[in-house]
């Protein structure tokens, strides 16, 4: 079944959601770059699961949410989203700030989800090094730190090969502004999260790129230690975007992990 787009009202906030596939529900929470649409890895996973990919409030074409001030708020919003959609015991996957959101949600209501996939998540202060300040760089330069080797990215031309037009620039600025609103002070982590992660009993797959220059791979080790039932997979020759950089490998990891449910 081809994917479709819907605008879903969660309270007074309407969010854009891409839905496709068949089978048990998998909710996908995007990172700071915004919802990149129906990607190659999603199409592979959607052969066995129904994928729900919402665009966060304040991002893309979703409504603004000026009341929202933290990733905690975003996690609570997505608990409400699950209720509105009538979804229970979903598999939950999040990338970068979406991974942080997924982790926070899991600490709030672990019974709402079945299996958890965290992909290069922010949310923890690195024991060594630091999370790169993504607001310091112009988009073109930031992309150099985000992807390890553009030549190996199958969808590079489609995603990044064209100079953005006015509409794309406006969305990028909107995404950037909302990311700053949600993740600033302290930058990209919640000092309370480490104390709540041990509450999450759900089987968890953590995926990281060995060459991630945005969030140090040591954060993956920290998540693995704090989550009682977690496995960490580190992909070689991969940066901060495993689903985009190695879509087939990533899709197979996800399918194998979810298939154990």
Task: Give residue ranges: language-model regions.
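Acidic catalytic loop of the alpha/beta-hydrolase fold
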Residues: 211-215
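Flexible "cap/lid" loop of the alpha/beta hydrolase fold
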Residues: 103-108, 113-145
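Active-site loop/oxyanion-hole signature of alpha/beta-hydrolase fold enzymes
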Residues: 52-94, 252
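Hydrophobic, aromatic-rich cap/lid helix
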Residues: 166-195, 199
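Catalytic active-site module of serine/aspartate enzymes centered on a nucleophile-bearing elbow/loop
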Residues: 230-261
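Short beta-strand/loop motif that positions the catalytic acidic residue
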Residues: 200, 206-208
């Amino acid at each position: 079944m081809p994917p479709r787009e819907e605008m879903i009202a969660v309270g007074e906030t309407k969010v854009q959601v891409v839905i496709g596939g068949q089978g048990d529900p998998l909710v996908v929470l995007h990172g700071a770059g915004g919802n990149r649409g129906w990607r190659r890895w999603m199409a592979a996973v959607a052969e066995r699961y129904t994928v729900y990919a919402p665009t966060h409030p304040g991002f893309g074409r979703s409504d603004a949410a000026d009341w929202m001030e933290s990733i905690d708020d975003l996690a609570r919003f997505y608990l409400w989203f699950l209720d509105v959609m009538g979804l229970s015991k979903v598999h939950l996957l999040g990338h970068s700030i979406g991974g942080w959101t997924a982790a926070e949600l899991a600490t709030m209501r672990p019974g709402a989800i079945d299996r958890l996939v965290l992909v290069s998540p922010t949310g923890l202060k690195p024991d060594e090094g630091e999370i790169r300040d993504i607001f310091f760089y112009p988009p073109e330069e930031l992309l150099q730190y985000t992807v390890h080797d553009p030549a190996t990215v199958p969808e590079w031309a489609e995603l990044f090969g064209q100079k953005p037009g006015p509409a794309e620039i406006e969305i990028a600025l909107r995404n950037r502004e909302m990311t700053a609103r949600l993740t600033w002070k302290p930058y990209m982590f919640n000092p309370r999260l480490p104390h709540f992660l041990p509450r999450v009993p759900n089987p968890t797959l953590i995926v990281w790129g060995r060459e991630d220059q945005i969030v140090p791979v040591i954060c993956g080790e920290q998540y693995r230690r704090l989550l009682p039932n977690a496995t960490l997979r580190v992909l070689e020759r991969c940066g901060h975007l495993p689903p985009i950089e190695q879509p087939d490998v990533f899709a197979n990891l996800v399918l194998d992990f979810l298939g154990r449910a």
